[in-house]
Amino acid sequence: MKRKLAAAIASVLFVFSPNAQTQAPATAKGPAEFRDATAAAGIKFVHNNGAYGKKYLPETLGPGVAFIDYDNDGWPDIFLVNGMDWPGHPAKHSTPKLYHNNHDGTFTDVTHKAGLDVEMFGLGVTVGDYDNDGNDDLFVTAYGQSHLFHNNGNGTFTDVTQKAGLGGVKEFSTSAAWVDYDRDGRLDLVVANYVTWSPEADLYCTMDGKSKSYCTPESYKGASIRLWHNNGDGTFSDVTKQAGLYEPTSKTLGIAVLDFDNDGWPDILISNDTQPNKLYRNNGNGTFTEKAVVAGVAFSEDGVARAGMGVDTADYDRSGNTSLLITNFSNQMISLYHNEGRGLFVDEAPRSEVGRASLLTLGFGCFFFDYDLDGWPDILVVNGHIDPDIQKVQANVKYAEPPHLFRNLGKGKFAEVTKTAGAAFAAARVGRSVAYADVYNNGRLDILMSTNGGPVSLFKNEAVGTANHSLRVKLIGTKSNRDGIGAVVRVTTAEGTQTQMLRSGSSYLSASELVLTFGVGQQSKVDAVEIRWPSGQIDKLGATNAGQTVTVTEGKGQTLARQFGK
Protein backbone atom coordinates (compact mmCIF):
# COMPACT_ATOMS: atom_id res chain seq x y z
CA MET A 1 0.00 0.00 0.00
CA LYS A 2 2.03 2.91 -1.26
CA ARG A 3 2.16 6.00 0.91
CA LYS A 4 3.52 8.27 -1.79
CA LEU A 5 1.80 11.62 -2.03
CA ALA A 6 3.64 12.27 -5.28
CA ALA A 7 1.41 9.83 -7.11
CA ALA A 8 -1.65 11.80 -6.12
CA ILE A 9 -0.12 15.20 -6.90
CA ALA A 10 1.05 14.05 -10.31
CA SER A 11 -2.45 12.85 -11.13
CA VAL A 12 -4.08 16.24 -10.47
CA LEU A 13 -3.88 17.20 -14.13
CA PHE A 14 -6.70 18.32 -16.36
CA VAL A 15 -7.85 15.44 -18.52
CA PHE A 16 -10.48 15.84 -21.21
CA SER A 17 -12.43 12.99 -22.73
CA PRO A 18 -13.91 13.72 -26.16
CA ASN A 19 -16.41 10.92 -25.70
CA ALA A 20 -18.13 12.35 -22.63
CA GLN A 21 -21.84 12.66 -23.39
CA THR A 22 -23.35 16.14 -23.37
CA GLN A 23 -26.67 15.06 -21.87
CA ALA A 24 -27.16 15.77 -18.18
CA PRO A 25 -29.62 14.43 -15.64
CA ALA A 26 -32.50 16.52 -14.46
CA THR A 27 -32.03 18.59 -11.32
CA ALA A 28 -32.37 16.51 -8.16
CA LYS A 29 -35.77 16.80 -6.48
CA GLY A 30 -34.23 16.72 -3.01
CA PRO A 31 -31.17 15.63 -1.07
CA ALA A 32 -29.96 12.08 -0.88
CA GLU A 33 -31.07 10.42 2.32
CA PHE A 34 -30.24 6.99 3.67
CA ARG A 35 -31.80 6.08 7.02
CA ASP A 36 -30.06 3.61 9.31
CA ALA A 37 -32.53 0.73 9.47
CA THR A 38 -30.22 -1.83 11.08
CA ALA A 39 -31.87 -1.98 14.50
CA ALA A 40 -35.39 -1.87 13.08
CA ALA A 41 -34.46 -4.73 10.74
CA GLY A 42 -33.32 -6.88 13.66
CA ILE A 43 -29.80 -7.32 12.35
CA LYS A 44 -27.37 -7.92 15.20
CA PHE A 45 -23.91 -8.65 13.92
CA VAL A 46 -20.41 -7.60 14.95
CA HIS A 47 -17.43 -8.67 12.87
CA ASN A 48 -14.74 -10.69 14.64
CA ASN A 49 -11.43 -9.82 12.96
CA GLY A 50 -9.46 -11.96 15.40
CA ALA A 51 -7.26 -9.08 16.56
CA TYR A 52 -5.58 -9.59 19.92
CA GLY A 53 -2.47 -7.42 19.64
CA LYS A 54 -0.26 -9.35 17.21
CA LYS A 55 -1.44 -7.22 14.27
CA TYR A 56 -1.70 -10.05 11.76
CA LEU A 57 -2.38 -8.85 8.21
CA PRO A 58 -5.71 -10.71 7.57
CA GLU A 59 -7.29 -8.85 10.49
CA THR A 60 -7.39 -5.62 8.49
CA LEU A 61 -9.38 -6.77 5.46
CA GLY A 62 -12.88 -8.12 6.23
CA PRO A 63 -15.73 -8.62 6.29
CA GLY A 64 -17.67 -9.16 3.09
CA VAL A 65 -21.45 -8.87 2.75
CA ALA A 66 -23.94 -10.22 0.23
CA PHE A 67 -27.54 -10.05 -0.85
CA ILE A 68 -28.92 -13.44 -1.91
CA ASP A 69 -32.52 -14.47 -2.52
CA TYR A 70 -31.77 -17.95 -1.26
CA ASP A 71 -35.42 -19.04 -1.05
CA ASN A 72 -36.59 -17.51 -4.35
CA ASP A 73 -39.41 -15.50 -2.80
CA GLY A 74 -38.40 -12.34 -4.65
CA TRP A 75 -37.04 -10.58 -1.55
CA PRO A 76 -33.26 -10.22 -1.02
CA ASP A 77 -31.88 -11.92 2.06
CA ILE A 78 -28.58 -11.02 3.73
CA PHE A 79 -25.39 -13.05 4.17
CA LEU A 80 -22.59 -11.72 6.38
CA VAL A 81 -19.06 -13.10 6.35
CA ASN A 82 -17.23 -13.41 9.66
CA GLY A 83 -13.70 -14.01 10.89
CA MET A 84 -12.59 -16.01 13.89
CA ASP A 85 -10.11 -16.03 16.73
CA TRP A 86 -6.58 -17.13 15.96
CA PRO A 87 -5.58 -20.65 17.06
CA GLY A 88 -4.34 -20.64 20.62
CA HIS A 89 -6.24 -17.47 21.49
CA PRO A 90 -9.93 -18.41 21.51
CA ALA A 91 -12.32 -15.93 23.07
CA LYS A 92 -15.62 -16.48 21.29
CA HIS A 93 -17.27 -18.68 18.68
CA SER A 94 -18.04 -16.69 15.54
CA THR A 95 -19.58 -17.79 12.26
CA PRO A 96 -21.12 -16.21 9.16
CA LYS A 97 -24.74 -15.12 9.44
CA LEU A 98 -27.73 -15.61 7.14
CA TYR A 99 -30.72 -13.32 7.68
CA HIS A 100 -34.08 -14.09 6.05
CA ASN A 101 -36.08 -11.14 4.70
CA ASN A 102 -39.53 -11.18 6.33
CA HIS A 103 -41.06 -8.81 3.72
CA ASP A 104 -41.93 -6.22 6.37
CA GLY A 105 -38.58 -4.50 6.87
CA THR A 106 -37.36 -7.05 9.39
CA PHE A 107 -35.01 -10.02 9.13
CA THR A 108 -34.69 -13.31 11.02
CA ASP A 109 -31.39 -15.03 11.77
CA VAL A 110 -31.63 -18.47 10.13
CA THR A 111 -27.91 -19.31 10.13
CA HIS A 112 -28.13 -22.49 12.18
CA LYS A 113 -31.24 -23.75 10.40
CA ALA A 114 -29.54 -23.15 7.05
CA GLY A 115 -26.42 -25.09 8.06
CA LEU A 116 -24.12 -22.10 7.61
CA ASP A 117 -22.77 -21.84 11.16
CA VAL A 118 -19.30 -22.91 10.03
CA GLU A 119 -16.34 -21.28 11.74
CA MET A 120 -13.63 -19.97 9.39
CA PHE A 121 -11.49 -16.88 8.91
CA GLY A 122 -13.88 -15.64 6.27
CA LEU A 123 -13.18 -12.60 4.12
CA GLY A 124 -15.35 -12.34 1.00
CA VAL A 125 -18.37 -13.85 -0.74
CA THR A 126 -19.90 -14.25 -4.17
CA VAL A 127 -23.35 -15.48 -5.16
CA GLY A 128 -24.37 -17.57 -8.17
CA ASP A 129 -26.23 -20.69 -9.30
CA TYR A 130 -23.28 -22.82 -10.37
CA ASP A 131 -25.31 -25.98 -11.07
CA ASN A 132 -28.28 -24.28 -12.80
CA ASP A 133 -30.83 -25.81 -10.44
CA GLY A 134 -32.62 -22.51 -9.86
CA ASN A 135 -31.14 -21.87 -6.42
CA ASP A 136 -28.29 -19.43 -5.81
CA ASP A 137 -25.23 -20.85 -4.08
CA LEU A 138 -22.53 -19.22 -1.94
CA PHE A 139 -18.77 -19.21 -2.32
CA VAL A 140 -17.05 -17.77 0.75
CA THR A 141 -13.39 -16.80 0.53
CA ALA A 142 -11.14 -17.11 3.54
CA TYR A 143 -7.63 -17.06 4.88
CA GLY A 144 -7.01 -20.80 4.76
CA GLN A 145 -9.74 -22.92 3.21
CA SER A 146 -12.47 -21.17 1.24
CA HIS A 147 -15.91 -22.82 1.15
CA LEU A 148 -18.53 -23.61 -1.49
CA PHE A 149 -22.04 -23.93 -0.04
CA HIS A 150 -24.63 -25.60 -2.26
CA ASN A 151 -28.18 -24.29 -1.91
CA ASN A 152 -30.43 -27.32 -1.45
CA GLY A 153 -33.60 -25.43 -2.33
CA ASN A 154 -35.27 -26.13 1.02
CA GLY A 155 -33.75 -23.36 3.11
CA THR A 156 -30.54 -25.26 3.83
CA PHE A 157 -27.02 -25.32 2.42
CA THR A 158 -24.44 -28.10 2.20
CA ASP A 159 -20.68 -27.53 2.28
CA VAL A 160 -19.54 -29.22 -0.94
CA THR A 161 -16.01 -27.78 -1.02
CA GLN A 162 -14.27 -31.15 -1.03
CA LYS A 163 -16.78 -32.83 -3.34
CA ALA A 164 -16.45 -29.97 -5.84
CA GLY A 165 -12.67 -30.34 -6.04
CA LEU A 166 -12.01 -27.05 -4.29
CA GLY A 167 -10.64 -28.56 -1.09
CA GLY A 168 -7.01 -28.63 -0.08
CA VAL A 169 -6.37 -25.18 -1.56
CA LYS A 170 -5.46 -23.06 1.43
CA GLU A 171 -4.64 -19.53 0.38
CA PHE A 172 -5.19 -15.91 1.44
CA SER A 173 -8.29 -15.41 -0.72
CA THR A 174 -10.19 -12.13 -0.90
CA SER A 175 -12.75 -11.28 -3.58
CA ALA A 176 -14.35 -13.74 -5.99
CA ALA A 177 -16.76 -13.71 -8.93
CA TRP A 178 -18.81 -16.15 -10.95
CA VAL A 179 -18.24 -15.79 -14.69
CA ASP A 180 -19.10 -18.00 -17.66
CA TYR A 181 -15.81 -17.21 -19.39
CA ASP A 182 -16.24 -19.87 -22.11
CA ARG A 183 -19.98 -19.25 -22.58
CA ASP A 184 -20.88 -22.92 -22.20
CA GLY A 185 -23.89 -22.15 -20.00
CA ARG A 186 -22.17 -22.98 -16.72
CA LEU A 187 -20.74 -20.51 -14.21
CA ASP A 188 -17.01 -20.73 -13.65
CA LEU A 189 -15.27 -19.21 -10.64
CA VAL A 190 -12.45 -16.68 -10.44
CA VAL A 191 -10.86 -16.17 -7.02
CA ALA A 192 -8.52 -13.37 -5.95
CA ASN A 193 -5.56 -14.12 -3.71
CA TYR A 194 -3.67 -11.47 -1.77
CA VAL A 195 -0.18 -12.43 -0.57
CA THR A 196 1.77 -15.41 0.71
CA TRP A 197 1.45 -15.06 4.49
CA SER A 198 1.15 -17.14 7.63
CA PRO A 199 1.39 -16.40 11.37
CA GLU A 200 4.70 -18.23 11.39
CA ALA A 201 6.06 -16.00 8.62
CA ASP A 202 4.65 -12.77 10.04
CA LEU A 203 7.15 -9.90 9.99
CA TYR A 204 7.71 -7.06 12.43
CA CYS A 205 6.75 -3.72 10.92
CA THR A 206 6.54 -0.33 12.56
CA MET A 207 5.37 3.13 11.54
CA ASP A 208 6.87 5.10 14.43
CA GLY A 209 9.92 3.00 15.24
CA LYS A 210 8.46 2.15 18.65
CA SER A 211 5.51 -0.22 18.30
CA LYS A 212 4.37 -2.93 15.90
CA SER A 213 2.06 -1.91 13.09
CA TYR A 214 0.31 -3.86 10.37
CA CYS A 215 2.74 -4.71 7.59
CA THR A 216 1.99 -3.57 4.06
CA PRO A 217 1.91 -6.08 1.18
CA GLU A 218 5.36 -4.99 -0.01
CA SER A 219 6.66 -7.12 2.86
CA TYR A 220 5.32 -10.36 1.38
CA LYS A 221 5.38 -12.28 -1.89
CA GLY A 222 2.34 -12.10 -4.14
CA ALA A 223 -0.11 -14.81 -5.17
CA SER A 224 -1.90 -15.50 -8.43
CA ILE A 225 -5.64 -15.39 -8.91
CA ARG A 226 -7.26 -18.74 -9.71
CA LEU A 227 -9.74 -19.62 -12.43
CA TRP A 228 -11.86 -22.69 -11.76
CA HIS A 229 -13.64 -24.22 -14.77
CA ASN A 230 -17.09 -25.65 -14.11
CA ASN A 231 -17.06 -29.24 -15.38
CA GLY A 232 -20.85 -29.53 -15.37
CA ASP A 233 -20.92 -32.44 -12.92
CA GLY A 234 -20.63 -30.48 -9.69
CA THR A 235 -16.84 -30.32 -9.84
CA PHE A 236 -14.32 -27.67 -10.87
CA SER A 237 -10.87 -27.83 -12.47
CA ASP A 238 -8.07 -25.31 -11.96
CA VAL A 239 -7.37 -23.85 -15.42
CA THR A 240 -5.45 -20.77 -14.29
CA LYS A 241 -2.25 -21.51 -16.17
CA GLN A 242 -3.75 -22.77 -19.43
CA ALA A 243 -6.04 -19.73 -19.47
CA GLY A 244 -3.04 -17.40 -19.27
CA LEU A 245 -4.03 -15.95 -15.89
CA TYR A 246 -1.20 -17.23 -13.73
CA GLU A 247 0.73 -14.28 -12.29
CA PRO A 248 2.34 -14.94 -8.88
CA THR A 249 3.39 -11.31 -8.38
CA SER A 250 -0.21 -10.10 -8.14
CA LYS A 251 -1.63 -9.01 -4.79
CA THR A 252 -5.31 -8.90 -5.58
CA LEU A 253 -8.14 -7.46 -3.51
CA GLY A 254 -10.85 -6.70 -6.09
CA ILE A 255 -12.35 -8.49 -9.11
CA ALA A 256 -14.78 -7.18 -11.71
CA VAL A 257 -16.16 -8.85 -14.80
CA LEU A 258 -16.85 -6.68 -17.83
CA ASP A 259 -16.80 -6.61 -21.62
CA PHE A 260 -14.58 -3.60 -22.19
CA ASP A 261 -14.24 -4.12 -25.95
CA ASN A 262 -17.88 -5.08 -26.61
CA ASP A 263 -17.01 -8.34 -28.35
CA GLY A 264 -19.48 -10.43 -26.35
CA TRP A 265 -16.85 -12.25 -24.28
CA PRO A 266 -16.48 -11.50 -20.54
CA ASP A 267 -13.15 -9.95 -19.58
CA ILE A 268 -11.64 -9.79 -16.09
CA LEU A 269 -10.31 -6.74 -14.23
CA ILE A 270 -8.36 -7.16 -11.00
CA SER A 271 -7.22 -4.42 -8.65
CA ASN A 272 -3.80 -5.10 -7.18
CA ASP A 273 -2.32 -3.67 -3.99
CA THR A 274 1.14 -2.16 -4.72
CA GLN A 275 1.34 -4.16 -7.94
CA PRO A 276 0.06 -3.16 -11.39
CA ASN A 277 -3.64 -3.71 -11.97
CA LYS A 278 -4.49 -6.37 -14.56
CA LEU A 279 -7.05 -6.23 -17.36
CA TYR A 280 -7.44 -9.65 -18.94
CA ARG A 281 -9.06 -9.66 -22.38
CA ASN A 282 -11.01 -12.81 -23.17
CA ASN A 283 -9.76 -14.25 -26.46
CA GLY A 284 -12.87 -16.38 -26.94
CA ASN A 285 -10.92 -19.65 -26.98
CA GLY A 286 -10.49 -20.32 -23.27
CA THR A 287 -7.49 -18.02 -22.91
CA PHE A 288 -6.92 -14.41 -21.85
CA THR A 289 -4.39 -11.73 -22.81
CA GLU A 290 -3.25 -9.10 -20.31
CA LYS A 291 -4.00 -5.57 -21.60
CA ALA A 292 -3.77 -3.26 -18.57
CA VAL A 293 -0.53 -1.53 -19.58
CA VAL A 294 -1.54 -0.76 -23.16
CA ALA A 295 -5.05 0.18 -21.99
CA GLY A 296 -3.68 2.68 -19.48
CA VAL A 297 -5.11 1.16 -16.28
CA ALA A 298 -2.09 -0.64 -14.81
CA PHE A 299 -0.33 2.33 -13.18
CA SER A 300 -0.86 5.89 -12.06
CA GLU A 301 0.02 8.63 -14.54
CA ASP A 302 3.60 8.76 -13.25
CA GLY A 303 4.09 5.02 -13.77
CA VAL A 304 3.66 3.93 -10.16
CA ALA A 305 1.54 0.96 -9.14
CA ARG A 306 -1.16 2.15 -6.78
CA ALA A 307 -2.71 0.30 -3.86
CA GLY A 308 -5.87 -0.93 -5.59
CA MET A 309 -8.66 -2.13 -3.30
CA GLY A 310 -12.24 -2.26 -4.57
CA VAL A 311 -13.39 -2.14 -8.18
CA ASP A 312 -16.55 -1.72 -10.23
CA THR A 313 -17.49 -1.02 -13.84
CA ALA A 314 -20.35 0.77 -15.59
CA ASP A 315 -21.33 2.83 -18.61
CA TYR A 316 -21.73 5.94 -16.46
CA ASP A 317 -22.02 8.43 -19.35
CA ARG A 318 -24.14 6.42 -21.84
CA SER A 319 -21.26 6.23 -24.29
CA GLY A 320 -21.93 2.56 -24.92
CA ASN A 321 -18.56 1.64 -23.39
CA THR A 322 -17.85 0.25 -19.94
CA SER A 323 -15.66 2.43 -17.71
CA LEU A 324 -13.80 1.48 -14.52
CA LEU A 325 -13.80 2.57 -10.88
CA ILE A 326 -10.92 1.53 -8.59
CA THR A 327 -10.46 2.60 -4.97
CA ASN A 328 -6.93 3.21 -3.73
CA PHE A 329 -4.91 3.95 -0.60
CA SER A 330 -4.88 7.31 1.17
CA ASN A 331 -2.86 10.00 -0.65
CA GLN A 332 -3.64 8.34 -4.00
CA MET A 333 -7.28 9.26 -4.82
CA ILE A 334 -9.83 7.07 -6.57
CA SER A 335 -9.26 6.01 -10.18
CA LEU A 336 -12.15 6.68 -12.58
CA TYR A 337 -11.02 5.27 -15.91
CA HIS A 338 -13.22 6.40 -18.80
CA ASN A 339 -13.41 3.94 -21.68
CA GLU A 340 -12.42 5.88 -24.80
CA GLY A 341 -13.02 2.91 -27.09
CA ARG A 342 -10.31 1.15 -29.09
CA GLY A 343 -9.08 -0.49 -25.88
CA LEU A 344 -7.94 2.78 -24.28
CA PHE A 345 -8.86 4.37 -20.95
CA VAL A 346 -8.28 7.84 -19.47
CA ASP A 347 -8.43 8.58 -15.73
CA GLU A 348 -11.16 11.21 -15.36
CA ALA A 349 -10.96 11.44 -11.55
CA PRO A 350 -8.64 14.48 -11.41
CA ARG A 351 -11.06 16.67 -13.35
CA SER A 352 -14.02 15.72 -11.17
CA GLU A 353 -14.95 15.85 -7.51
CA VAL A 354 -14.27 12.11 -7.33
CA GLY A 355 -10.53 12.66 -7.35
CA ARG A 356 -10.34 15.77 -5.19
CA ALA A 357 -12.62 14.44 -2.46
CA SER A 358 -10.84 11.09 -2.18
CA LEU A 359 -7.23 12.25 -1.95
CA LEU A 360 -6.82 11.56 1.77
CA THR A 361 -9.27 8.70 2.30
CA LEU A 362 -8.53 4.98 1.97
CA GLY A 363 -11.27 3.42 -0.14
CA PHE A 364 -12.39 -0.20 -0.10
CA GLY A 365 -15.90 -1.21 -1.22
CA CYS A 366 -17.34 0.73 -4.14
CA PHE A 367 -19.98 0.57 -6.83
CA PHE A 368 -21.96 2.45 -9.41
CA PHE A 369 -25.70 2.62 -8.63
CA ASP A 370 -28.50 5.02 -9.45
CA TYR A 371 -29.63 6.04 -5.96
CA ASP A 372 -31.94 8.84 -7.17
CA LEU A 373 -33.29 6.94 -10.19
CA ASP A 374 -32.54 9.73 -12.65
CA GLY A 375 -31.00 7.30 -15.13
CA TRP A 376 -27.37 8.18 -14.44
CA PRO A 377 -25.14 5.87 -12.34
CA ASP A 378 -23.90 7.49 -9.15
CA ILE A 379 -20.92 6.31 -7.09
CA LEU A 380 -20.60 5.06 -3.51
CA VAL A 381 -17.22 4.41 -1.87
CA VAL A 382 -16.70 3.05 1.66
CA ASN A 383 -13.56 4.22 3.47
CA GLY A 384 -11.45 3.25 6.46
CA HIS A 385 -7.75 2.95 7.20
CA ILE A 386 -5.98 -0.28 8.13
CA ASP A 387 -4.01 0.86 11.18
CA PRO A 388 -5.60 2.43 14.28
CA ASP A 389 -2.43 4.43 14.93
CA ILE A 390 -2.16 6.08 11.52
CA GLN A 391 -2.67 9.59 12.94
CA LYS A 392 0.52 9.27 14.96
CA VAL A 393 2.50 9.52 11.74
CA GLN A 394 0.03 11.21 9.36
CA ALA A 395 -2.02 13.81 11.21
CA ASN A 396 -4.35 14.49 8.28
CA VAL A 397 -5.30 10.83 7.74
CA LYS A 398 -7.94 9.20 9.96
CA TYR A 399 -8.50 5.57 10.95
CA ALA A 400 -12.30 5.86 10.83
CA GLU A 401 -13.48 7.75 7.76
CA PRO A 402 -16.84 8.74 6.28
CA PRO A 403 -17.94 7.23 2.96
CA HIS A 404 -18.13 9.11 -0.32
CA LEU A 405 -21.45 9.41 -2.15
CA PHE A 406 -21.07 11.08 -5.53
CA ARG A 407 -24.08 12.16 -7.60
CA ASN A 408 -23.66 11.86 -11.36
CA LEU A 409 -24.13 15.32 -12.88
CA GLY A 410 -23.64 14.16 -16.44
CA LYS A 411 -20.90 15.32 -18.80
CA GLY A 412 -18.40 13.18 -16.87
CA LYS A 413 -18.78 15.17 -13.66
CA PHE A 414 -19.81 14.17 -10.16
CA ALA A 415 -20.69 16.09 -6.98
CA GLU A 416 -20.16 14.72 -3.48
CA VAL A 417 -23.46 14.65 -1.58
CA THR A 418 -22.42 12.55 1.43
CA LYS A 419 -23.34 15.19 3.99
CA THR A 420 -26.91 15.37 2.70
CA ALA A 421 -27.42 11.62 3.09
CA GLY A 422 -27.99 11.66 6.85
CA ALA A 423 -25.77 11.78 9.91
CA ALA A 424 -25.67 8.01 10.43
CA PHE A 425 -24.79 7.34 6.82
CA ALA A 426 -22.08 10.03 6.75
CA ALA A 427 -20.53 8.96 10.06
CA ALA A 428 -16.88 7.94 10.18
CA ARG A 429 -16.29 4.18 10.35
CA VAL A 430 -13.59 1.66 9.52
CA GLY A 431 -15.49 0.74 6.39
CA ARG A 432 -14.73 -2.26 4.22
CA SER A 433 -17.38 -3.90 2.03
CA VAL A 434 -20.63 -2.61 0.61
CA ALA A 435 -23.47 -4.05 -1.48
CA TYR A 436 -26.87 -2.91 -2.73
CA ALA A 437 -30.35 -4.35 -3.24
CA ASP A 438 -33.98 -3.30 -3.24
CA VAL A 439 -34.61 -4.58 0.27
CA TYR A 440 -38.12 -3.12 0.63
CA ASN A 441 -39.49 -3.86 -2.86
CA ASN A 442 -40.09 -0.19 -3.63
CA GLY A 443 -37.82 0.17 -6.66
CA ARG A 444 -35.04 1.97 -4.80
CA LEU A 445 -31.60 0.62 -4.01
CA ASP A 446 -30.70 0.22 -0.35
CA ILE A 447 -27.20 -0.23 1.05
CA LEU A 448 -25.50 -2.81 3.27
CA MET A 449 -22.17 -1.65 4.66
CA SER A 450 -19.62 -3.47 6.84
CA THR A 451 -17.15 -2.26 9.45
CA ASN A 452 -13.89 -4.02 10.21
CA GLY A 453 -14.10 -5.29 13.78
CA GLY A 454 -17.51 -3.65 14.14
CA PRO A 455 -21.18 -3.86 13.16
CA VAL A 456 -22.81 -3.95 9.76
CA SER A 457 -25.27 -1.23 8.81
CA LEU A 458 -28.37 -1.42 6.63
CA PHE A 459 -29.36 1.92 5.10
CA LYS A 460 -32.82 2.42 3.62
CA ASN A 461 -32.94 4.68 0.59
CA GLU A 462 -35.32 7.52 1.43
CA ALA A 463 -34.23 10.21 -1.00
CA VAL A 464 -36.38 13.18 0.00
CA GLY A 465 -38.94 14.26 -2.57
CA THR A 466 -37.77 11.79 -5.20
CA ALA A 467 -40.64 11.05 -7.55
CA ASN A 468 -38.46 9.28 -10.08
CA HIS A 469 -39.41 5.85 -11.35
CA SER A 470 -37.50 2.66 -12.06
CA LEU A 471 -37.81 -0.60 -13.94
CA ARG A 472 -36.17 -3.71 -12.53
CA VAL A 473 -35.18 -6.67 -14.69
CA LYS A 474 -34.65 -10.21 -13.42
CA LEU A 475 -33.19 -12.77 -15.81
CA ILE A 476 -33.65 -16.53 -16.08
CA GLY A 477 -31.27 -18.26 -18.44
CA THR A 478 -32.09 -21.45 -20.33
CA LYS A 479 -29.25 -21.95 -22.79
CA SER A 480 -27.17 -19.48 -20.79
CA ASN A 481 -26.43 -19.89 -17.08
CA ARG A 482 -29.60 -19.82 -14.98
CA ASP A 483 -28.83 -16.42 -13.36
CA GLY A 484 -28.14 -14.76 -16.71
CA ILE A 485 -24.77 -13.53 -15.44
CA GLY A 486 -22.96 -11.92 -18.35
CA ALA A 487 -26.14 -10.83 -20.13
CA VAL A 488 -26.21 -7.23 -21.37
CA VAL A 489 -29.48 -5.34 -20.95
CA ARG A 490 -30.32 -2.10 -22.75
CA VAL A 491 -33.29 0.02 -21.73
CA THR A 492 -34.42 2.88 -23.99
CA THR A 493 -36.61 5.84 -23.07
CA ALA A 494 -37.20 9.24 -24.62
CA GLU A 495 -34.10 10.41 -22.75
CA GLY A 496 -31.72 7.85 -24.22
CA THR A 497 -30.40 4.32 -23.75
CA GLN A 498 -28.89 2.83 -20.60
CA THR A 499 -26.71 -0.28 -20.70
CA GLN A 500 -25.95 -2.67 -17.85
CA MET A 501 -24.32 -6.08 -17.67
CA LEU A 502 -25.55 -8.51 -15.02
CA ARG A 503 -22.39 -9.35 -13.13
CA SER A 504 -21.10 -11.24 -10.15
CA GLY A 505 -18.22 -9.84 -8.10
CA SER A 506 -17.23 -6.15 -8.08
CA SER A 507 -17.05 -3.81 -5.08
CA TYR A 508 -14.82 -5.44 -2.45
CA LEU A 509 -15.40 -8.89 -0.91
CA SER A 510 -19.10 -8.45 -1.67
CA ALA A 511 -22.11 -9.44 -3.76
CA SER A 512 -24.97 -7.13 -4.68
CA GLU A 513 -28.33 -8.50 -5.80
CA LEU A 514 -28.62 -10.27 -9.16
CA VAL A 515 -31.40 -8.00 -10.42
CA LEU A 516 -30.80 -4.93 -12.60
CA THR A 517 -32.39 -1.60 -11.66
CA PHE A 518 -32.86 1.10 -14.31
CA GLY A 519 -33.81 4.57 -13.09
CA VAL A 520 -36.00 6.29 -15.68
CA GLY A 521 -36.62 9.65 -14.03
CA GLN A 522 -40.11 11.03 -14.63
CA GLN A 523 -40.86 8.52 -17.38
CA SER A 524 -43.77 6.21 -16.52
CA LYS A 525 -42.68 3.61 -19.04
CA VAL A 526 -39.72 2.62 -21.19
CA ASP A 527 -39.87 2.33 -24.95
CA ALA A 528 -37.82 -0.83 -25.36
CA VAL A 529 -35.82 -3.45 -23.47
CA GLU A 530 -33.19 -5.60 -25.17
CA ILE A 531 -31.37 -8.54 -23.57
CA ARG A 532 -28.28 -10.04 -25.19
CA TRP A 533 -27.63 -13.35 -23.48
CA PRO A 534 -24.22 -15.05 -23.17
CA SER A 535 -25.50 -17.76 -25.52
CA GLY A 536 -26.01 -15.19 -28.26
CA GLN A 537 -29.80 -15.21 -27.91
CA ILE A 538 -31.42 -11.77 -28.16
CA ASP A 539 -34.78 -11.08 -26.50
CA LYS A 540 -36.68 -7.83 -26.95
CA LEU A 541 -39.57 -6.24 -25.10
CA GLY A 542 -41.64 -3.37 -26.42
CA ALA A 543 -43.09 -0.56 -24.33
CA THR A 544 -42.94 -1.61 -20.68
CA ASN A 545 -44.35 0.17 -17.65
CA ALA A 546 -41.99 1.37 -14.94
CA GLY A 547 -42.81 0.72 -11.28
CA GLN A 548 -42.35 -3.04 -11.53
CA THR A 549 -39.91 -5.93 -11.69
CA VAL A 550 -40.16 -7.90 -14.92
CA THR A 551 -38.76 -11.39 -15.25
CA VAL A 552 -37.36 -12.26 -18.67
CA THR A 553 -36.73 -15.90 -19.52
CA GLU A 554 -34.20 -16.58 -22.26
CA GLY A 555 -35.94 -17.31 -25.55
CA LYS A 556 -39.42 -16.64 -24.12
CA GLY A 557 -39.39 -12.93 -23.34
CA GLN A 558 -41.26 -11.52 -20.35
CA THR A 559 -42.69 -14.32 -18.23
CA LEU A 560 -43.60 -12.47 -15.03
CA ALA A 561 -44.25 -8.94 -13.79
CA ARG A 562 -44.56 -7.78 -10.19
CA GLN A 563 -45.47 -4.25 -9.21
CA PHE A 564 -43.41 -2.61 -6.50
CA GLY A 565 -44.92 -3.01 -3.05
CA LYS A 566 -46.60 -6.30 -3.91
Where are the language model's segments positioned?
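Asp-box/WD-like beta-propeller blade repeats and closely related beta-sheet repeat scaffolds
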Residues: V110-Y130, N135, V140-Y181, V191-E218, ...
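Gly/Ser/Thr/Pro-enriched helix-cap/hinge segments flanking short amphipathic alpha-helices
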Residues: Q23-A26, G30-E33, A51, E353-R356, ...
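Bacterial N-terminal signal peptides
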Residues: A7-S17
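Beta-propeller blade repeat segments, especially FG-GAP/WD-type strand-to-loop junctions
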Residues: T22-R35, H89-V110, Q145-D159, L203-T206, ...
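Beta-propeller blade termini
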Residues: G62-N72, H100, F121-N135, L148-H150, ...
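Hydrophobic beta-strand segments that make up the repeating blades of beta-propeller
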Residues: W75-N82, D133-A142, L189-N193, D263, ...
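Repeat-based blade/solenoid architectures
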Residues: I43-G64, K92, A114-T126, L166-A177, ...
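Short, conserved, GDST-rich strand-edge loop motifs in beta-rich repeat architectures
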Residues: V81-H93, N193-Y220, V381-K398
